[in-house]
């Protein structure tokens, strides 16, 4: 079977799954893994795991992971008028909320709605230029009152996702909601396809994880079961090629997958990843040998599961591959199919390496700067 990056990505983007409600994506991931993998399971939290490669008990264990959930909302209250108050799940960009189309997972099926906005003709002062506070926003599903909304299948706790089906833009770019992190899920399926008939010297565990956007720790039960020697995460990173971010960094779409040197989130979570230099060298050398374009990134304000995985068990060496993405956590994220394909190529090359090529143990001499 020929793997199509675009078709696979678009099929995943058409699914909805905020944190804690990833089943539709998990079902697709599990079914795809079961076509080739030696062993596939879904744990009690909903993480989907597939094992490829060596069955030897002492084989080096490489875990590659990406999260299935997307940012969104949850219904908090149904007003007597039938309008819905809601809370954020994860960090959807609040500035984009008013006027957005949303999908609600009703008891009997999906329901369309929109986030209301004060009529521009009657808006005054800051109301015309500043987004309202979250507690001033509401969702309109066309219900005439609370009882009508309940008859339509809405209740407190109903999941809500942003609505924007995938579209193709120019130069291999795509626009959609939930590119964070269906890009990573697509990469997992691309690697799975590549490894299906390939003998490996190591054991590779592909993990589609849950609740990254909510608590960043949904994957923890998996790593305690798998006990990997090395973990590599796949996620998005802000692309800084737009007019508002050009002075921030050189990370750009269509210039290869990002290799994270540092990410850090200090607003409450206080965690992040400083990638060990030996792993940076491994990633850059492998990319160079396979003619795969990569770009380094330092990303304060960004955090992934690696921030917590690295301090589990006896300490797990971690690295992160980041696919540049414009307009993150908005209904219209933009990323490159070319960068996604490069990510799949790099991960596949890593999975095909011999155990001796993985620098698991820390260096004992002076730290050397990573270089290809």
UniProtKB/Swiss-Prot annotation:
Q: Which residues bind a divalent metal cation 1?
A: 67, 180, 235
Enzyme class label: hydrolase
What is the official name of this protein in its record? Answer: Putative aminopeptidase SgcX
Which one of the record's GO molecular function terms can you name? metal ion binding
Which residues are the active-site ones? 212
Cofactors demanded by this protein: a divalent metal cation
Cofactor binding mode and count:
Binds 2 divalent metal cations per subunit.
GO terms of biological process kind:
proteolysis
What are the binding positions for a divalent metal cation 2 in this chain?
Answer: 180, 213, 329
Which keywords does UniProt give here? Aminopeptidase, Hydrolase, Metal-binding, Metalloprotease, Protease
UniProt source species: Salmonella typhimurium (strain LT2 / SGSC1412 / ATCC 700720)
Q: Name one Pfam family in it.
A: Peptidase_M42
Q: Which InterPro entries match?
A: Peptidase_M42, Peptidase_M42_aminopept, Peptidase_M42_dom2
- What family name appears in the similarity comment? Belongs to the peptidase M42 family.
Keyword Signal carried by entry: no
CDD domains referenced in this protein's UniProt entry, alphabetically? M42_Frv
């Amino acid at each position: 079977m020929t793997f199509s990056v675009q078709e696979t990505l678009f099929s995943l983007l058409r699914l909805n799954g905020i944190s804690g409600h990833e089943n539709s994506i998990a079902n697709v991931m599990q079914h795809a893994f079961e076509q080739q993998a030696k062993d596939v399971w879904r744990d009690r939290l909903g993480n989907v795991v597939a094992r490829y490669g060596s069955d030897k008990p002492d084989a080096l264990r490489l875990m590659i992971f990406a999260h299935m959930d997307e940012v969104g909302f949850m219904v908090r209250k149904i007003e007597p008028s039938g309008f819905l108050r809601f809370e954020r799940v994860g960090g959807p960009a609040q500035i984009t909320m008013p006027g957005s189309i949303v999908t609600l997972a009703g008891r009997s099926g999906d329901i369309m709605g929109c986030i209301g906005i004060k009529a521009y003709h009657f808006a005054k002062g800051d109301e015309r230029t500043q987004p309202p506070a979250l507690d001033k926003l509401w969702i309109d599903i066309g219900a005439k009152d609370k009882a009508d909304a309940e008859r339509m299948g809405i209740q407190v706790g109903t999941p809500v996702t942003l609505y924007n089906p995938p579209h193709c833009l120019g130069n291999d770019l795509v626009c959609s909601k939930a590119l964070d992190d269906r890009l990573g899920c697509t990469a997992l399926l691309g690697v799975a396809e590549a490894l299906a008939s390939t003998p490996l010297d190591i054991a590779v565990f592909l993990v589609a994880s849950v609740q990254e956007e909510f608590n960043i720790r949904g994957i923890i039960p998996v790593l305690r079961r798998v006990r990997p020697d090395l973990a590599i995460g796949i996620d998005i990173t802000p692309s800084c090629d737009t007019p508002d971010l050009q002075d921030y960094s050189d990370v750009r779409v269509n210039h290869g997958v990002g290799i994270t040197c540092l990410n850090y989130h200090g607003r409450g979570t206080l965690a992040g990843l400083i990638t060990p230099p030996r792993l940076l060298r491994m990633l850059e050398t492998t990319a160079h040998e396979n003619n795969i374009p990569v770009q380094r990134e330092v990303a304060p304000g960004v955090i992934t599961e690696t921030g917590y995985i690295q301090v589990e068990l006896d300490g797990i060496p971690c690295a992160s591959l980041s696919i540049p993405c414009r307009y993150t956590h908005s209904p219209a994220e933009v990323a490159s199919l070319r960068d996604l394909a490069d990510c799949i190529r790099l991960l596949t090359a890593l999975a095909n390496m011999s155990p001796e090529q993985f620098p698991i143990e820390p260096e004992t001499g002076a730290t050397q700067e990573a270089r290809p």
